[in-house]
Structures are given as C-alpha cells and as structure tokens.
Swiss-Prot record:
Region (Cytoplasmic ballast): 395-595
GO cellular component: cell-cell junction; external side of plasma membrane; membrane; mitochondrion; neuromuscular junction; neuronal cell body; plasma membrane; postsynapse
Single biological process term from Gene Ontology: extrinsic apoptotic signaling pathway
Protein name in the entry: P2X purinoceptor 7
Cytoplasmic side: 1-22, 354-595
Name of the gene this protein is made from: P2rx7
Site (Selectivity filter 1): 342
Transmembrane domains' residue ranges: 23-46, 329-353
Chief location category: membrane
Annotated Na(+) binding sites: 342
Annotated GO MF terms: ATP binding; channel activity; extracellularly ATP-gated monoatomic cation channel activity; identical protein binding; lipopolysaccharide binding; potassium channel activity; purinergic nucleotide receptor activity; signaling receptor activity
Domain of life: Eukaryota
Length: 595
C-alpha cells in the first residue's frame, strides 16, 4: 500500500504567481495608497501607544471635607417664631458613606419634639376620614407614619384623619426651603487622596505630589494637579448652578482619569480631573427629584425619649477612577505590525477593482464609444486578459465549435435534445492567440509543393468560393462534404456539424489542412516526438495517426488545450481523417467525454 504522505510532500513550498503591470497611473495609485496606509499605521502606533502592554488601574480613594457655615432659620419657642442662628461644621453636614463617595448636606427640614404616642395622621391623600369605618385597626400603609388604631380623630378644625401610633406629631410634608439653608457650602473644600497601583508593571503612585502646597485650590488652567477642590468650582466646571442644586440636592461625579506612560524614556503618570452631573437635571419632571434622606437626633426630656427628625437634602459626590498604564512590550509591537500588514493589500483591491470595472462589457459598449476622454481606459481590457484566466467547469454538456467563416469560437453548454449542433447558437468566446513556437521547433516539411498546371499563386480565401452542395450531404451541411452520422439516434445530433456557418468552400480542401492534419510524415513525427522508440503495426498505426490527426485539428482550430479537450470536429473533417486513416471494421465511437 503506498504511503499517504511522504517527506517530499512535506518539504515543499507553494507561492502565488503574480502579474506585473508596467503602468505609470497604477504605479502612482499603488504608492499613494501605500503611503496613506503607512502614515495611518505609524500615526496610530505612536498616538495610541499600541506598542505598549496596557493594564487597568487599581485604585483607593479617601476624602476630607472642610468648611464652616452659618445658618439662619425661623425657630419657634413658646409659640413665638423668631430668627435663630446656628453654626454647622464638618461633623454636622457630612455623613459617612460606603465606597468612593461623600455627602454634603445643603438643606434640611426639621420635625422637632417627636415622642412615641397616639396622634392623628398627616392629612395626605388616602389618610383623611369622616368616621371610624374608614380606619382599620392595625393597618400599616407603606406611605403612613405609623400603625392605625381604628379611630377617626380631628387633625385640625376642618379635617379629620385616622389616628396612628407613631412618633408624634407626625412629619409634615413640607417643601425644601428656598434658598437653601446651607447655600454657603459652595465655599467648602474637599481634599481627595487617590492611590493607584498597576500590579502587572509593579508601579504605585498617588495624586498628591510631595511639592503640593496645602493652601492650593484646583484650577483647570492655573493649578490642574492640586487635589483640593472648592465645591462651587466643581459645579462651575460641570456647567451647573450650585445654588439651585443645593435646594433639592443632587449627585455629582468627579472623574479621575489616569493615562500613564511607564516607559523610561517618556515617563508620565499624572491624573486628569473632570466633572459631570450624574442625576436627572430636570427636577420638576422627576418623580423623586433631587437627593435626600432622613435621620434623627435622640434625646430625653423629663425621662421621656424624644427625637428631632431631620430630612436632609444635599449633594452626593461620586469619585470615579479609571485609566490604564502602558509599558513597552515587544510582543505587542509584533502583534500590531502583523495585524496591520494586511492593510497594504488595499492597493491591490483598488487597482483590481479599477481594472475589472473599466474592462467590463458595459464600458466597452456604453461608455467608450461616446466618451473620448475615457478611451485610454480601454487598455484595462488588455490588463484584464493578462491577469485573469477563465476556466469553464468540465461538464458533460460543455462543447466548443469553430466555424471557418467566423473569427470567434462558440461555446455550447446545454443539452441538444435532438437539435442539430449546427443550428445551436451558443455563446461567442474570443479565439485564443496561436503560439507557433512549437511548430517552429519541429522540422516539418511545410514548404510549398509545386504548383499544378493552371493553379494560381494567389491565396484563395475559403469564404470567397461557394462550393456546390452534394446530393448525399445532409440538410445542415454548408460545404457539401459532410456525411450523415452513424451514431445512435440519441447521440446523432452531436455530429451534425459542418465546418462552415454559411455556404462556402470546405476547410478540408485547404492546403494547410492537408499539411497539418493529413500529412502522414507530420503525424508520425509527432508520435515519435512523444515516444521515440514507438513501433506499431499497421492497424495500431492507423489508430494512433487518426487520433493524432483529430488532436492536430482541434489544437489548430481552437488554440487552447482546454478548448481542444471539448472540441467537436465538423463532420466533413472527421470523415476526411477517417478516410485517410481508416479503421478495418469501419465502426467509429465518436466524441468521448474526456473527464
């Protein structure tokens, strides 16, 4: 059993054969596209540092808020309302939050002196009543301030609500004060400490420089590396109004972006700060506008526990840290170069597109005859023929036909279904250019034979003379030398073919037909050229010479070996060859499919 694979099959190399076109226009297009691609690749390599191995940042954040605010508000004591002044420091307006966030209270609503007892519910929607039947004992509404007792009691002179067991008096639904009580909080400052680490590069740093002055304040232009921020400046950089946001509260994002170049020759690793609002700006359209929460201060009075409930409005600052650190890596550089080499194939794609477009049948028939400036583009047809080779699928229905009175070859790719091959139109294909180099190498006796008496020395064209039609020739014959086919009925239409499309002289009467196809010396020389030691008997010699004559005619009239394999010889030529090199029993098989 032969081996399925050998070292000769393994130790080999395959490459593509290319066509080189000497053209100034296409050469210019190629180099322009190459320069564009090279410029883009180089720019992207340097600007985006694609030669580096990137790693995301690992970060920790710590904040400290400083500032004092004086608050003036209405205070009720003994039924008398007067202005009260109070001082708020860091412990009063900041609250511990989880994650990279901190909160600054800017406004509040107090409910003082609450104690756990029974009292009427605040007259919100769904809490008002007219009798005890509207109140259900033990009912707990998520929107309620307590648990209903089942009684309907007066809330004021005009309204009644269900009695609840809760912190009384219940909290009233009040609007946040305008302007905000702690509107001076825009002058507060926050110190942000941000430590980052790139474990893959073993690099750690922070945003606070050793040379930083503790009295500096961040400014986008004058001091962009200072890590102390004024709250009002943060809102100004984000395009927001601190005074308006302070009334209902909101959420502000502080973005710290680290784009670190850790290469020793161009080291740079400093943060860049930016700010933007994260919550819904349209507080009037929001279902729950702003940002607020409740907390309580508990105390005892006459041994009774009481509390002051505070609804705090304020601004939550979320610190968002992101970025990458990059360092030169030879593997990343090789991968990038390898991935961009295919971009240079853009020139090939564009030039092939131009050649294919300007060599199309549409341009040949619809553009070039009417556009004089486009005539130089006809050279693309020549380039296309040199670049592309069309190969037909070797199907049993494929046949090629050549008429001596037509400059082209006809391709027939269909079932004949009893229809004579002579009348099938087929598709016109260009006749391949004949290569005479093989003939010139052979010492063939192709010199002119002596003229017979009365013979003219002028070349007589085959289409100039109309031969009389023989009475024995079939109806489809145009030269008068064809014979009816002897094949079975279902295959007979394949041999119903003449050498001419229109009436005229038969190709078998030409001198070249005799010298190339019927010359015994020429055919024997071709057989010996293939097998120098060939020795055959008379019958075998005739068979060899007959098939060689078939091949000589097909190669002569069709040029291409691919076409010659599927060429159908005219009846007149086929019978003339059989007459010269007959078979003993006189039975011939006809055309055989080569594959």
């Amino acid at each position: 059993m032969p081996a399925c694979c050998s070292w000769n099959d393994v130790l080999q190399y395959e490459t593509n054969k290319v066509t080189r076109i000497q053209s100034t226009n296409y050469g210019t297009v190629k180099w322009v596209l190459h320069m564009i691609v090279f410029s883009y690749i180089s720019f992207a390599l340097v600007s985006d540092k694609l030669y580096q191995r990137k790693e995301p940042v690992i970060s920790s954040v710590h904040t400290k808020v400083k500032g004092i605010a004086e608050v003036t508000e209405n205070v009720t004591e003994g039924g008398v309302t007067k202005l009260g002044h109070s001082i708020f420091d860091t412990a009063d307006y900041t609250f511990p939050l989880q994650g990279n966030s901190f909160f600054v209270m800017t406004n509040y609503v107090k409910s003082e002196g609450q104690v756990q007892t029974l009292c009427p519910e605040y007259p919100r929607r769904g809490a008002q009543c007219s009798s005890d039947r509207r109140c259900k004992k033990g009912w707990m509404d998520p929107q309620s301030k307590g648990i209903q007792t089942g009684r309907c009691v007066p809330y004021d002179k005009t309204r009644k609500t269900c009695e609840v067991s809760a912190w009384c008096p219940t909290e009233e639904e009040k609007e946040a004060p305008r302007p905000a009580l702690l509107r001076s909080a825009e002058n507060f400052t926050v110190l942000i400490k941000n430590n980052i680490h790139f474990p893959g590069h073993n690099y750690t740093t922070r945003n606070i420089l050793p040379t930083m002055n503790g009295s500096c304040t961040f400014h986008k232009t004058w001091d962009p590396q200072c890590s102390i921020f004024r709250l009002g400046d943060i809102f100004q950089e984000a395009g927001e109004n601190f005074t308006e946001v302070a009334v209902q509260g909101g959420i502000m994002g502080i973005e710290i972006y680290w784009d670190c170049n850790l290469d020793s020759w161009s080291h740079h690793c400093r943060p860049r700060y930016s700010f933007r609002r994260l919550d819904d700006k349209n507080t009037d359209e929001s279902f729950v506008p702003g940002y607020n929460f409740r907390y309580a201060k508990y105390y005892k009075e006459n041994n009774v526990e009481k509390r002051t409930l505070i609804k705090a409005f304020g601004i939550r600052f979320d610190i968002l840290v992101f970025g990458t650190g990059g360092k030169f890596d030879i593997i990343q550089l090789v991968v990038y170069i390898g991935s961009t080499l295919s971009y240079f194939g853009l020139a090939t794609v564009c030039i092939d597109l131009l050649i294919n477009t300007y060599s199309s049948a549409f341009c040949r028939s619809g553009v070039y005859p009417y556009c004089k400036c486009c005539e130089p583009c006809t050279v693309n047809e020549y380039y296309y023929r040199k670049k592309c080779e069309s190969i037909m699928e070797p199907k049993p229905t494929l046949k090629y036909v050549s008429f001596v009175d037509e400059p082209h070859i006809r391709m027939v790719d269909q079932q004949l279904l009893g229809k004579s091959l002579q009348v099938v139109k087929g598709q016109e294909v260009p006749r391949p250019q004949m290569d005479f180099s093989d003939l010139s190498r052979l010492s063939l006796s192709l010199h002119d034979s002596p003229l017979t008496p009365g013979q003219s020395e002028e070349i007589q064209l085959l289409h100039e003379e109309v031969a009389p039609k023989s009475g024995d020739s079939p109806s489809w014959c145009q030269c008068g030398n064809c014979l009816p086919s002897r094949l079975p009925e279902q295959r007979r239409a394949l041999e119903e073919l003449c050498c001419r499309r229109k009436p005229g002289r038969c190709i078998t009467t030409s001198k070249l037909f005799h010298k190339l196809v019927l010359s015994r010396d020429t055919l024997q020389l071709l057989l010996l050229y293939q097998d120098p030691l060939l020795v055959l008997g008379e019958e075998a010699t005739n068979s060899r010479l007959r098939h060689r004559a078939y091949r000589c005619y097909a190669t002569w009239r069709f040029g291409s070996q691919d076409m010659a394999d599927f060429a159908i010889l005219p009846s007149c030529c086929r019978w003339r060859i059989r007459k010269e090199f007959p078979k003993t029993e006189g039975q011939y098989s006809g055309f055989k499919y080569p594959y």
